[in-house]
Curated annotation (Swiss-Prot):
Name of the protein in its database record: Type VII secretion system accessory factor EsaA
Biased amino acid composition, Basic and acidic residues: 680-697
Organism: Staphylococcus aureus (strain Newman)
Assembly and oligomerization: Homodimer. Interacts with EssB.
Alphabetized PANTHER family for the sequence: TRANSPORT PERMEASE PROTEIN, TRANSPORT PERMEASE YVFS-RELATED
Length: 1009
């Protein structure tokens, strides 16, 4: 057992020795080179000092111009040849300071440009250009670094002073130009005032004078007109126009007499025609003809039974005779004759096809045409697939079925066009196999070029317009139901009353029996409803007119009036882009060409088969010769079929007794009707009596009207004369009033023009005042704070003479002359190795002596837990003591300033406790695997240190736990980040390590875990 323990101890010791030697070699190589570089940088003057520039400046605006002094500062440094400058991010600069890549980091703050342009401020804020030097620099290198920063800052301050002087001169120059502009604007205002207002106002009274003259003339004419009109009215006698309404005028009487005579004459003529009807109709002839037809039908019916057998016998004899003639016919071609004819015909056709030059030329022409057609078809397929630069729209995208569905096609169409795309890919592969690499073709990549676009529906929407007229006696309510996928804007007018387009119920005026409905609005698609809308691509709006609160009675058969005015807009056309139709057209065109290509493929070089053509022609002729016997048999079969169907045919012709009987009955009825008509014509018609004496009453009606009509005519003539005179006066008045109206319109137009000009002039004057006020305000700011009372503003003077100050972002380390400062990397490595040794000591003791039991388990069942707590406490206390010792040594070695020492020692103690507790737990619990994990963490740290680059942290640095501890100490020593969160995390890790050591599970059998 002891031998086995010594073997473990020896292995661990060798591993620790190898790790320490490797660490010393690595540190000597890395940091010795850095120290050597530091010494060489002193000897090689300033060009070996690497300076990292971190530009955090944000642009600002001054006098309407964009100012970026941070960029100007960097450009200034780019011309500097004595030092090596690099513009990097803050993280890269800090990493460079840590690993020796940079000696100085200069930070241009965020408000650098804003603070630098404080020429108008009374007390300008100080501008600080921040810088930081690397930890552990030699005193001579640090002095050179300070000198470099000072020189760069002095040069930049000189440039800023030049910028300030240029800005002041520009302000004065702008003021000079603005004064000239003010004078020009004032001159323009005066000129416009004269032309726009002064001259038109001087001409304005003339318009009033013309209007007054025309008004006086019109007033005189109106007075004369009314006087004449009154005179005519006063001289007229109202009795003159009164007519006795008991009588009609003579013209009415004459018209009535004429109409009476016409009707009387028509009546006489009708009576004469009625009397002569019986003489003009020959009914006896019609009746005799029908009776003769009836007798013939009787004879035909009696002959049907005797003629049927004769028909059958005649048909049978004719068919038998025809059958004998056909059976007697024999084929003129014997079998030997047919074979000889086959042989001779074959030889003749072969000779004709072989020696026919026209046929050979035709075959060659067909072959050439097929080759040319195949070449043209292949070129067309190439053009269908490939997209030519700029102008070509007939090409094929490499689209899938899902792409077609997303573009708006249904599943059936998507399957169809997906198959065409696969054909295009198949042809592309065949084409590329035949062509060199430079001529290969490919389908155009698809990137949603033909996807559905709903932006126009979301932004512009779709117009909703409808006009209807609804008539009903019982409609009293309107219900509006809108599409939930759209936002509606607009209104619904019902008999002129407006209602918003939204989901609502509106009570209508029941006094109206007719409703004029006008819908006018816009429906815009909701962004969150785009997916649901694309399922049917239809906008719905329903207006339902009906009755509210109607209760139907059981016996009420009157239906409820409901009028549904529904607007359905299919918006599929608003979704598809032109690219979709172009793509589908290109696919259809390729499909047609490809089918032609597959039909003609493989037939171009196939020779013409003469033998097959000859055999086909000879076989056709021989078949015709041999088919004589078969044709004869077929004809005989047809004759037999005719004989079988002859009885039925004769029965159909002769057995029509029912139709004959019906015709006989109809003829008998017609004869009876004609007999009745004949009796009616034989009777004498009764002549109506007409009283012609009534016409005498109209002859006495016009005698009393002649005198009154004459008197009315005279007065009408006089009234017409007065009216004509009144009309001429009215025309004159109308002309005068029109002139007055024109003058008023001129006054109105002139006044309106004057108002517009006055408003324009007022706006221009207001704009000029605003520009002048702005200039005065801005010019007032120029150097307004250049003096403080009667004295010069010393703060502004000091700022403009030396605007930018340098600010050292001091480290927590004290400068100790030429003494080298230990690196945080070496410090962390030493702490970790010390914790590994401590953990192994605890593990070896427990392995040799067993678990530490400070309290015997016999006294209480909980003593085992107390022993675990005490064991964890001993391990943690050991880490605390080691951390205190290491912290005191490192504090003196790092020369930490007085205000930072307590936090530094606390960080070291917590870090050391974490290392000791975690490493001890790994060895106690998982033994060899724990040792492997500890060494793996150490190896990751070595790799991270070796691969550390100025460009940032690598992947190894991110997964290495020790790298985070290293960064923690580096940031603290450089006073970059607060450590409050770091202390909390370390405390939590200490508690976790303490608890883990309390619950160690001991296995009964020794085994490798």
């Amino acid at each position: 057992m002891k031998k086995k323990n010594w073997i473990y101890a020896l292995i661990v010791t060798l591993i620790i020795i190898i790790a320490i030697v490797s660490m010393i070699f690595f540190v000597q190589t890395k940091y010795g080179d850095q120290s050597e570089k530091g010494s060489q940088s002193v000897s090689n003057k300033n060009n070996k000092i690497h300076i990292a520039i971190v530009n955090e400046d944000q642009p600002t605006t001054y006098n309407g111009k964009k100012v970026e002094l941070g960029q100007a500062f960097i450009k200034r440094l780019a011309n500097e040849k004595n030092y090596k400058f690099e513009t990097v991010t803050r993280n890269v600069a800090e990493s460079g300071l840590k690993n020796g890549g940079y000696q100085v980091m200069i930070v241009i703050p965020e408000n650098f440009s804003k603070l630098a342009m404080q020429l108008d401020a009374k007390t300008p804020s100080k501008i600080s250009l921040q810088y930081k030097t690397a930890v552990g620099q030699k005193e001579e290198v640090a002095k050179n670094t300070e000198k470099v920063v000072s020189n760069v800052l002095n040069d930049f301050n000189k440039n800023l002073v030049e910028i300030y002087l240029t800005s002041i001169i520009d302000n004065l120059h702008n003021a000079q130009k603005n004064v000239g502009a003010i004078m020009t604007r004032e001159h323009g205002v005066n000129s416009k005032f004269s032309n726009y207002l002064l001259n038109p106002i001087n001409d304005f009274p003339e318009l009033f004078t013309d209007t007054l003259v025309n008004s006086i003339s019109a007033n005189k004419d109106i007075t004369k007109w009314f006087q004449t009109y009154n005179k005519s009215l006063l001289s007229a006698n109202s009795d003159t126009f009164r007519v006795n309404t008991d009588y009609n005028v003579s013209t009415l009487i004459e018209k009535q007499n004429s109409l009476f005579d016409e009707h009387n004459t028509a009546m006489d003529k009708m009576l004469q025609d009625y009397k002569s009807q019986k003489d003009s109709v020959e009914l006896d002839n019609y009746i005799n003809a029908l009776k003769q037809m009836d007798s013939q039908i009787d004879q035909q019916s009696s002959m049907q039974d005797t003629g049927k057998e004769e028909y059958k016998q005649t048909v049978k004899e004719n068919l038998d005779k025809l059958r004998e003639i056909i059976q007697s016919q024999e084929s003129p071609f014997s079998k030997g004759m047919i074979e000889d004819y086959r042989k001779q015909l074959t030889e003749s056709l072969q000779d004709e096809l072989a020696n026919n030059k026209d046929l050979q030329d035709a075959l060659n022409s067909i072959k050439m045409n097929n080759a040319q057609f195949a070449e043209n078809l292949e070129k067309q397929l190439h053009d269908d697939i490939v997209k030519e630069p700029d102008t070509d729209t007939t090409f094929i995208y490499n689209m899938s079925k899902q792409d077609f569905i997303a573009a708006g096609l249904n599943e059936g169409e998507a399957n169809k066009y997906e198959a065409i795309v696969k054909e295009a890919k198949r042809y592309k592969n065949e084409y590329n196999l035949k062509k060199p690499l430079a001529e290969h073709i490919n389908l155009t990549d698809y990137d949603n070029q033909v996807a559905q676009d709903t932006s126009s529906l979301i932004n512009d929407g779709v117009k909703v317009q409808r006009t209807e007229t609804i008539k009903s006696n019982d409609i009293n309510q309107l219900t509006v139901a809108t599409d939930p996928h759209f936002n509606f804007e607009g209104d619904i007018k019902i008999n002129g009353k407006k209602y918003d387009i939204k989901d609502q119920s509106v009570q209508l005026d029941t006094s109206n029996k007719e409703y004029k409905v006008e819908v006018n609005g816009v429906a815009k698609l909701k962004k969150d409803a785009e997916k649901d809308f694309l399922k049917d691509k239809t906008m719905h709006l329903q207006l339902l007119f009906g009755q509210a609160n109607r209760q139907d009675e059981p016996n009420d058969k009157k239906a409820t009036s409901v009028v549904d005015v529904t607007l359905n807009h299919n918006l599929d056309g608003r979704l598809s882009k032109d690219a979709l139709s172009q793509q589908l057209s290109a696919l259809s065109r390729f499909d047609a060409h490809y089918k032609m290509y597959t039909d003609t493929k493989g037939r171009e070089d196939k020779p013409f088969d003469n033998k097959r053509l000859i055999d086909m022609m000879v076989d056709q002729v021989i078949n015709d010769m041999e088919s004589f016997k078969d044709d004869k048999v077929a004809v005989l079969h047809q004759i037999d079929s005719m004989e079988e169907n002859s009885d039925k045919l004769i029965d159909d012709i002769l057995n029509n007794k029912k139709n004959t009987t019906k015709n006989k009955e109809d003829i008998s009825k017609l004869i009876d009707q004609l007999e009745n008509v004949k009796k009616t014509f034989a009777e004498e018609p009764q002549e109506p009596k007409i009283d012609k004496g009534k016409n005498d009453e109209f002859n006495t009606m016009s005698s009393n009207l002649d005198k009154e009509i004459s008197r009315i005519s005279e007065k009408s003539t006089q009234l017409l004369s007065d009216t004509q005179e009144s009309k001429s006066i009215a025309d004159s008045v109308s002309g005068q009033l029109n002139q007055v109206d024109n003058n008023v319109n001129k006054l109105h137009a002139t006044g309106r023009a004057l108002g517009v000009r006055a408003n324009d002039l007022n706006r221009q004057m207001a704009k000029n005042d605003k520009d002048n006020e702005l200039f005065a305000k801005e010019f007032k700011k120029v150097l307004q704070n250049s003096k403080d009372g009667d004295r010069q503003n010393q703060a502004l003077k000091a700022f403009m003479s030396n605007p930018v100050q340098k600010k050292n972002l001091e480290n927590v380390l004290a400068n100790n002359g030429n003494t080298d400062v230990i690196s945080p990397t070496l410090f962390v490595l030493l702490m970790y190795l010390l914790s590994m040794i401590t953990a192994y000591i605890f593990y070896s003791y427990e392995r040799a002596k067993g678990q530490m039991n400070f309290i015997k388990d016999d006294y209480s069942s909980k003593n085992h837990l107390w022993n675990n707590v005490i064991t964890s406490g001993v391990i943690g206390t050991t880490g605390l003591v080691e951390g205190l010792i290491v912290g005191l040594i490192a504090m003196n070695k790092f020369h930490v300033l007085a205000g930072y020492r307590a936090k530094f020692i606390l960080m070291v103690i917590l870090t050391m406790m974490v290392f000791v507790l975690i490493n001890t737990y790994l060895l106690r619990q998982v033994k060899s695997i724990g040792m492997f994990l500890m060494i793996a963490a150490l190896g990751l740290y070595f790799v991270a240190m070796n691969n550390l680059k100025a460009a940032g942290q690598g992947v190894t640095n991110k997964i290495s736990p020790l790298s985070y501890i290293d960064n923690m100490f580096f940031n603290y020593l450089n006073a970059e980040h607060p450590i409050g969160l770091v202390l909390v995390i370390l405390t939590v890790l200490v508690i976790i390590g303490f608890v883990l050591n309390m619950f160690i599970k001991h296995f009964k059998k020794e085994r490798l875990i």
